């Protein structure tokens, strides 16, 4: 499988050739990072624009929160690429290509920008497994930043995992794996407790940013979250409570990021359940990397922000105090590069932005 050179060149140049204006320059004590998830269906069209915008905003890294490719069916962008357009695609051939397609067409445009890749539930849809994901994405899961942190925590921990963390610029970034119905496992919970214990006593850590695929339970979007399975609900509530206690004990900032639901929402833990059980932690859903867009949930009016039929990413600006400002950066059809339009055709780009939606009926069973 090959990517058209002109499309790749255009995307890479878009990332590399931007010169920030004075208004975009950050003070020496501020820096930015970019986050989104769910880039199946139309991610090959949308993600190059996200990469270009992340570079323009001087993001130190991009963090993907999982669901890279559909796996249960052929992604529309894969079907619409020049190599496959108008052809009948056998499922086995698609499965063989799917993750390489993601790496080439979605990660490639980030160029030299560091990328952290999280696992989502679509990465474990049969015949795919967590072990296959870990093997394919070993380059990212065992990147020097993650390997160094893992060995600093435990010199015997030589095997990369699908949950991980790293400390950067005073922030402990933590990725939790809730891709299957047995998570959070006791092993992962024990690992997280160790991370939180070290962060509590580490004066250099001023904030936690905890990312995962499905949102923790009892949010305003609980209908497509860790509420979907008993172990998820129980262990997810324990994690939320531990993070609440961490914040109260240390007075350090705590932020929660998820995707899984294909819309943008902030203030997702402003729910009656958490108001009655310890309080709200700042939380966001940003499943806006190219997947079919879903209707907003019934309680979305209680959120600070709630938008659907949008693509984009969350841009975090880290301040010296550890406080992080988050804002949603939308990418529009007009942001699509000429190379991407040429590769996928104007008609398919129009489909992605205008008709890649599933608002009337649920797009899929819960946590499929």
Label each residue range with its predicted role:
Residues 7-17:
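Bacterial N-terminal signal peptides
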Residues 199-221:
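Short acidic, glycine-rich surface-loop motifs adjacent to enzyme active sites
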Residues 33-35, 62-64, 117-118, 210, ...:
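Residue-level marker for buried hydrophobic side chains located in beta-strands
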Residues 303-368:
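A short C-terminal boundary segment appended to hydrolase-like catalytic domains
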Residues 32, 76-204, 223-255, 262-307, ...:
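Extended active-site neighborhood of metal-dependent phosphoesterases/phosphodiesterases
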Residues 1-4:
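Positively charged n-region of N-terminal signal peptides that target proteins for export
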